[in-house]
Every structure is written in C-alpha cells, then in structure tokens.
C-alpha cells in the first residue's frame, strides 16, 4: 500500500510537462518537527506517516531531487506559514549563510541541533521587491539573524539533505486575506522564469482537536474537507478554481481544521503564482496535500 502510493505520487510528478516557459509554483505541506522523530516515539497524536521515514518523509525525499533535476531553478523563493509580518511583505535579504530559527518548543535536544546549509541573495531579494511594488504591494527587505523557520528548514532538510548550492530566500505573508495573498502570487509570476517559488503550509492545523492530525482518529468532516481541497485545486478553469479555493473557507470544517488560518492561506499565494496555467495535486496524503500551480497548458 505504502510503496504503491509513493509510486503514484512520483508518477504524478513526472507527468508535469518539461519546462517550457515558467517553473510551476509549489504548494508544499511543510510538515512538522515530528518528521524528524522516529516512528517508535511515544507520541500518539501524529501517525507514523508524519514521522521519520514515513510516507510524508518519503515523498519529500523524492520531491527535492525531482525539483532540481526537472526545473533546474537558479534559486528558490519560499513563503512559510511561520513567517508573518504587518503592513508590508518582508523579504529576507543577505548573501551569506542563512541562519536557522528553531521556532518550536518541548522537543528532544537533537531537534535543536539540526543544520541546513543555504545562502541568500540580495539580488534576488531586490527582484522580489521590484515585482511586488509594480503591483503596488508594500514590501521591504529585512536582514538580521531571524533565520529560516522550521516551516522551511524541516522539509528542506529532507528534500535537500546536503544543503543547497543555489540561493534560498524566505518571504513573509503580510496578511491572512486570501485575495491579497493571491495578488502577491500574481505579482511574482514573472520570477518563475528563473526561480522555483514554494508556498508552505498545511491543509489541517489545529491544536483544539488533536485527533484531527491522524487519519485513523479524525472525524469524517476533516476528510471531507480535504477531498474538497483536492477538487478545488484541480478545477480546470482559472476563475472557477479561484472561486472554489475561496469557497473552502465556508466549509463547515474549515474553522475546525484552522482555528487560525495562517497554515491554510499559503495555498492562495501558490494559486496566484500559477493562476495562468493548470494545477495538479502531487501528494494527497491525509493532512499533507502538496500541489503544483501554473503548469503549462
């Protein structure tokens, strides 16, 4: 079952057409620090699929090399559910090593010793700022030692275990409003000529109902919500797709799955980035949906 599911995901990825004009944008289920915990750990909230060596881990292992080989990006731009700002979009700007921000608590010590090597790029950061300002979206570069949060370095450590030799730039979400984030994505579409743009979150993220994280214990409403997400993503026509994606916030289980929507709305950045093309779900694992947007038609 597990191996056939992984083969299915790989088949979906390989079916994405070879790059012609723009690199597809990726909506990525970034997972949690539990991806670094062994399946034998005592935790009963998260299934083994969400832990070290589980199905989500295996998907990320396969995804990283695929992205670099298929699209050969000159850099990676990433939005994370864990990087919010107020008033304007923040673009992390530096040329040296990206530090890491261990923004999780109560985990074993070794999870605070994880290393992931990558460098930023002030030049690419400036390109992002220019593209956003062309759309009258307030934006500024920031520096300092905040570093990449775990919504970036946890999945990227699995995807690129030896680090990256192309620049990696993190960008904030300046709002949780779906249409504003969709417009942020649209503003950056031209950068897909050279760069892979990733928008990371989770389609289920609640600490008010821990049973929701595990498919074996989750109420049927969470599973129905995920099915509606999958259908919305793969809607063919751009306007219909956008309407269905926006309509997901009216689903009876939306607020149960997201008491606060910061982990859901990165989906709208990816949708805006790929608003001019097709979209394809490449991982339908429960609670860990990932998809490409902006596939050439």
Curated annotation (Swiss-Prot):
Zn(2+) binds at residues 30, 82, 205, 263. Its EC number is 1.13.-.-. GO terms for molecular function: ferrous iron binding; oxidoreductase activity, acting on single donors with incorporation of molecular oxygen, incorporation of two atoms of oxygen; zinc ion binding. The keyword Cytoplasm applies. Its cofactor is Zn(2+). It is found in: Cytoplasm; Nucleus. May be involved in the metabolism of aromatic compounds. This is 4,5-DOPA dioxygenase extradiol-like protein. The lineage of its organism: Eukaryota, Fungi, Dikarya, Ascomycota, Taphrinomycotina.
């Amino acid at each position: 079952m597990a191996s056939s599911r992984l083969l299915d995901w790989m088949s979906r990825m390989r079916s994405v057409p070879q790059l012609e004009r723009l690199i597809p944008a990726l909506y990525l289920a970034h997972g949690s620090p539990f991806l670094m915990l062994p399946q034998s750990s005592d935790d009963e909230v998260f299934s083994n699929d969400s832990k070290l060596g589980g199905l989500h881990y295996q998907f990320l292992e396969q995804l990283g090399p695929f992205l670099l080989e298929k699209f050969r990006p000159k850099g990676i731009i990433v939005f994370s559910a864990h990087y919010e700002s107020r008033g304007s979009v923040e673009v992390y700007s530096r040329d040296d090593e990206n530090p890491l921000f261990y923004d999780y608590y109560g985990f074993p010590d070794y999870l605070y010793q994880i290393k992931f090597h990558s460098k930023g790029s002030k030049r690419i950061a400036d390109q992002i700022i220019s593209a956003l300002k062309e759309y009258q979206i307030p934006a500024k570069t920031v520096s300092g030692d905040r570093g990449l949060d775990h919504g970036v370095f946890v999945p990227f450590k699995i995807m690129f275990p030896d680090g990256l030799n192309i620049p990696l730039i993190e960008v904030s979400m300046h709002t949780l409003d779906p249409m504003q984030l969709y417009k942020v994505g649209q503003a950056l579409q031209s950068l897909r000529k050279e760069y892979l743009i990733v928008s990371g979150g989770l389609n289920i993220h609640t600490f008010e109902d821990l049973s929701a994280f595990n498919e074996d214990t989750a109420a049927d409403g969470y599973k129905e919500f995920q099915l509606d997400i999958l259908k919305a993503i793969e809607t063919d026509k751009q306007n219909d797709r956008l309407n269905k994606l926006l309509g997901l916030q009216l689903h009876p289980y939306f607020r149960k799955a997201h008491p606060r929507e910061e982990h859901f709305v990165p989906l709208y950045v990816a949708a805006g980035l790929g608003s001019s093309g097709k979209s394809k779900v490449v991982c339908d694992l429960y609670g860990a949906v990932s998809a490409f947007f902006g596939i050439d038609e």
